[in-house]
Amino acid sequence: MQAKAILRHTPTSPRKMRLVAGLVRGKAVDQAKAILLNSTKAASRNALQTLKSAVANYAQLNPDERVGDQELFVKSVFVDEGATLKRMLPAPMGRAYRVRKRSNHLTIVVDRVKNPETK
């Protein structure tokens, strides 16, 4: 049985979050946590928080199973675009430039490895 966690309205552009999501897609949870902890990207902090939440959701959904991080893997990670806040920045000659402050929604799905020794 799989479990998922969704982090909504993260104040990071979706393009930057997709770079981090690609690092952990398909990896074991313990490897994914190590990658996110050692990543220098600012978005990796939010991704780590969501990954921990997905693991906790798996434990909540399956109370009779005792699984460790090495028995779970990241089944899917996807990033959707959230709301865009539009702001104005003063520009030369009385004009204004539009600044788009983008946000995203991060979804992480974890599942149990079928054969732990082969994955």
Swiss-Prot record:
One of its GO terms (cellular component) is cytosolic large ribosomal subunit. Keywords: Ribonucleoprotein, Ribosomal protein, RNA-binding, rRNA-binding. The keyword RNA-binding applies. It holds the Pfam family Ribosomal_L22. CDD domains: Ribosomal_L22. One of its GO terms (biological process) is translation. InterPro entries: Ribosomal_uL22, Ribosomal_uL22_bac/chlpt-type, Ribosomal_uL22_bac/org-type, Ribosomal_uL22_sf. The keyword Coiled coil does not apply. Belongs to the universal ribosomal protein uL22 family. Part of the 50S ribosomal subunit. This protein binds specifically to 23S rRNA; its binding is stimulated by other ribosomal proteins, e.g. L4, L17, and L20. It is important during the early stages of 50S assembly. It makes multiple contacts with different domains of the 23S rRNA in the assembled 50S subunit and ribosome. The globular domain of the protein is located near the polypeptide exit tunnel on the outside of the subunit, while an extended beta-hairpin is found that lines the wall of the exit tunnel in the center of the 70S ribosome. This is Large ribosomal subunit protein uL22.
